């Protein structure tokens, strides 16, 4: 405050010269380097004020503040484009998932440009860089013994010849009896649901009745990381930067003990799992499925497994930066700066 008062009294001549950042913006030795992201907006709809106010606007305000302070600042964001929500919306609009992503990515970019959000780069997750980095992280986890394989019971539609992701199933909520509950959550009572728990389940693609079938999936072995995570959390909590709510939720997870977390899904739209036995896991259909538009054909085609969006999407922050600069690791693997 004293410095601000002093500069105010001395007038504009006392201000440091404005920074003229180079392109691309890269960390500079000896300076304060700030990397800012906001939550990646999902691509299957038109963004509304809640999206912008919820995360984008606050990040933009902070980015502008950092630049005014002459801090070396990079602000990146982009659309999150893989997963079942994209497939579902593509079905509704009669488009392939890629066509849907191309359409709504452009809409998002235009909206944020209209609001003058000061991104240095607004990218997307459906890129070769995303595939390369996500598969590299997967291979590193596999080589270090942090992955395991296990069987899940999952709903399979014999008519479509595919295992059904959570959002491709509707049925009656086992908790409140709501007749249009999704395979991941009930919109009436708000409880999370395992799709196989639904009563009277229906395939959203053909309205057929799916059957419970065992299927192999890959899991992140979180119990192996629990000890190291607890030690790291104690150090970071001591710094005082966590909100009370974030501390409470994290302590609850640790109190109950971490469980292995599934990182794969039987889908067509996502980053492929680069492991034999998961590249072409689902065999040909028994009869043609006419419910799918171009780009989502299932008849007679072997479907690969892809990474579950919760594993894949956070890597989008890295891949979007990598599409901005091939020196992205200087931002993401440089804790000293």
Regions flagged by a language model, labelled:
Residues 45-52, 119, 123, 149:
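Histidine-centered catalytic micro-motifs
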Residues 122-130, 160:
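Conserved short loop/turn motifs at secondary-structure junctions
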Residues 89-102:
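A charged helix-plus-loop insertion that forms the helical arch/lid used to bind
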Residues 1-77, 129-133, 176, 185, ...:
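Structured secondary-structure scaffolds
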Residues 79-85, 89:
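Short, charge-patterned binding micro-sites
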Residues 144-219:
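Cys/His-rich short segments
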Residues 99, 104-120:
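A glycine-rich helix N-cap at a beta->alpha junction
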């Amino acid at each position: 405050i004293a410095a601000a008062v002093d500069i105010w009294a001395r007038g504009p001549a006392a201000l440091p010269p404005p920074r003229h950042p180079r392109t691309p913006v890269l960390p500079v030795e000896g300076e304060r380097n700030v990397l800012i992201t906001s939550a990646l907006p999902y691509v299957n709809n038109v963004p509304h004020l809640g999206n912008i106010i919820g995360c984008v606007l606050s990040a933009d305000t902070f980015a502008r503040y950092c630049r005014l302070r002459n801090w070396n600042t990079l602000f990146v964001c982009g659309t999150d484009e893989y997963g079942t929500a994209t497939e579902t919306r593509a079905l509704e609009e009669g488009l392939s998932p890629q066509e849907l992503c191309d359409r709504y990515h452009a809409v998002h970019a235009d909206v944020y440009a209209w609001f003058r959000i000061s991104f240095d780069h607004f990218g997307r997750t459906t890129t070769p860089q995303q595939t390369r980095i996500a598969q590299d992280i997967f291979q590193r986890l596999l080589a270090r013994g942090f992955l395991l394989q296990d069987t899940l019971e999952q709903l399979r539609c014999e008519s479509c010849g595919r295992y059904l992701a959570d959002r491709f199933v509707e049925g009656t909520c086992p908790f409140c009896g709501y007749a249009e509950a999704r395979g991941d959550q009930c919109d009436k009572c708000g409880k999370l649901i395992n799709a196989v728990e639904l009563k009277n389940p229906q395939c959203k693609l053909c309205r057929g009745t799916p059957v419970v079938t065992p299927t192999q999936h890959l899991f992140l072995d979180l119990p192996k990381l629990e000890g190291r995570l607890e030690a790291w959390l104690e150090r970071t909590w001591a710094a005082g930067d966590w909100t009370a709510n974030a501390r409470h939720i994290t302590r609850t997870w640790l109190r109950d003990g971490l469980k292995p977390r599934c990182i794969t899904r039987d889908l067509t739209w996502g980053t492929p799992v680069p492991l034999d036995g998961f590249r072409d896991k689902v065999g040909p259909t028994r009869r043609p499925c006419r419910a799918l538009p171009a780009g989502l054909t299932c008849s007679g085609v072997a479907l690969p497994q892809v990474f579950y969006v919760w594993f894949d999407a956070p890597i989008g922050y890295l891949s979007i930066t990598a599409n901005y600069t091939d020196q992205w690791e200087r931002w993401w693997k440089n804790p000293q700066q």
